[in-house]
Amino acid sequence: MKHTNSKQKLKDIINFCQAIFTLCIICLYQANISNSYPIYAQQTYENPRESTGRIVCANCHLAQKNIYIEAPKEVLPNTVFETVVKIPYEFNKKQILGNGSKGDLNVGAVVILPEGFKLAPKDRMDEKLLKKTKNLYFNNYSQKLDNIIVIGPITGKDNQEITFPILAPDPQINKNTHFLKYSIYVGANKGRGQLYPSGEKSNNNPIPSNAEGRIEKIKPNEDGGYEVIIKTKDDETISQYVPIGLNLTIKEGQRIKAGEYITTDPNVGGFGQSEIEIVLQNPTRLISFIFFSISVLISQLFFVLKKKQFEKVQSLNQNF
């Protein structure tokens, strides 16, 4: 009896371990899926910023949205600083997902740094910065371009501000960098795109009519979409499929033109880009400026004291 109970307990432990292992695999798989979206650009474009200055994410996210960037005006070499990307988020809006259901908007961003600047390692971050970047997983755009950092998609509700920890280069070590003024370019999106890199449209688009004519019939499909039957002026019947999740703007008997939208626009997201300037400051120049300012201040102070002393002597001479 005891032997049977021991076997059963061992079997239960093995089953429990297998369940935990399976759960871990699923979590890792989902994590890989959630981080796979930036790979669209990474696989298609060697550099995400075109020669015109346009960031390639705009090729898939057609709607424009405002984004904002914050960074210090000056940084010292070999120091860690924050670059904050702000993505305005509307909590009352839902996006259409790939399966036609509605869900929260996700966000993503790419930061294009000057050559030599790169993602700061965790051992260089202070506690405050570690807390801000907790649960954020940044990736280099490619092995060659470690000055370009991508993140996303991540939940928009919790990430309206994304803090990028950046390590400034030291020109004394990296001879390709200099004490100059540089530009940081940022692109960020919220919600799904309208196109895939292949040029194929996603379901995040309004549906145009395939023909001119009269709406003969609207049939709901079992999957939740619609079949719209259009009768042309030549008495030809054309059937058009509207996928699940889209809202029709037409009704039976209505006349429409070819190319006229028969659904509302489901897109509630978009893409925006911005830039900011930053100076890599020379510490020697900064120290020299401080000493110069102090010397000027001391000189002015001595001048004032000397002037007061002179006025005092003049006053004494007049009394005699």
UniProtKB/Swiss-Prot annotation:
Record GO biological process: photosynthesis
Topology term for the membrane: Single-pass membrane protein
Residues where heme binds: Y37, C57, C60, H61
InterPro entries (UniProt xref): Cyt-f_TM (IPR024058), Cyt_f (IPR002325), Cyt_f_lg_dom (IPR024094), Cyt_f_lg_dom_sf (IPR036826), Rudment_hybrid_motif (IPR011054)
Database matches in SUPFAM superfamilies: Cytochrome f subunit of the cytochrome b6f complex, transmembrane anchor, Cytochrome f, large domain, Rudiment single hybrid motif
Transmembrane segments: 286-305
GO MF annotation list: electron transfer activity; heme binding; iron ion binding
Secretion signal, residue range per the UniProt entry: 1-36
Entry keywords, A to Z: Chloroplast, Electron transport, Heme, Iron, Membrane, Metal-binding, Photosynthesis, Plastid, Signal, Thylakoid, Transmembrane, Transmembrane helix, Transport
Record bears the keyword Chloroplast: yes
Membrane listed as a keyword: yes
Annotated localization: Plastid, Chloroplast thylakoid membrane
Protein family membership: Belongs to the cytochrome f family.
Subunit-structure text: The 4 large subunits of the cytochrome b6-f complex are cytochrome b6, subunit IV (17 kDa polypeptide, petD), cytochrome f and the Rieske protein, while the 4 small subunits are PetG, PetL, PetM and PetN. The complex functions as a dimer.
Protein name: Cytochrome f
Organism: Cyanidium caldarium
